[in-house]
From Swiss-Prot:
Keywords: Ribonucleoprotein, Ribosomal protein, RNA-binding, rRNA-binding. The keyword Transmembrane helix does not apply. PROSITE patterns: RIBOSOMAL_L14. This is Large ribosomal subunit protein uL14.
Length: 122
């Protein structure tokens, strides 16, 4: 479960390393985001010379979430960290590589580019 003020790891090579959630998309009263949900983040730590700079505000999609998620078949998926991939205005990833596994739920949410770049889909 991702909410406002949650610190997140960036799972792509856009230049950002750590970000903080400042808004969850999906209505006025929406409090939590889970796998495949979009959030607005503020960059807290970035690599020098990267595409993304510190203090920049951008959209992101949650690709790994520490809170377990129940699937239709009764199984649960859970990760060790909360991670996002930064998106551009068209909803495509800003980086050209994805680090670490991503959840299968992204395929259902039509993030095919992220799924194809990921080294492993769980």
């Amino acid at each position: 479960m991702i909410q406002k003020e949650t610190n997140l790891v960036v799972a792509d090579n856009s230049g950002a390393k750590k970000v903080r959630c400042i808004h969850v998309f999906g209505g006025t009263g929406r409090r939590y985001a889970s796998l495949g949900d979009q959030v607005i983040v503020s960059v807290k730590a970035a690599v020098p010379g990267g595409v993304v700079k510190k203090k920049e505000v951008c959209k992101a999609v949650v690709v790994r979430c520490a809170k377990e998620l129940r699937r239709k078949d009764g199984s649960y998926i859970r990760f060790d960290e909360n991670a996002v991939v930064l998106l551009n205005a068209q909803g495509e990833p800003r980086g050209t590589r994805i680090f670490g596994p991503v959840a299968r739920e992204l395929r259902d949410r039509k993030y095919m580019k992220i799924v194809s770049l990921a080294p492993e889909v769980l």
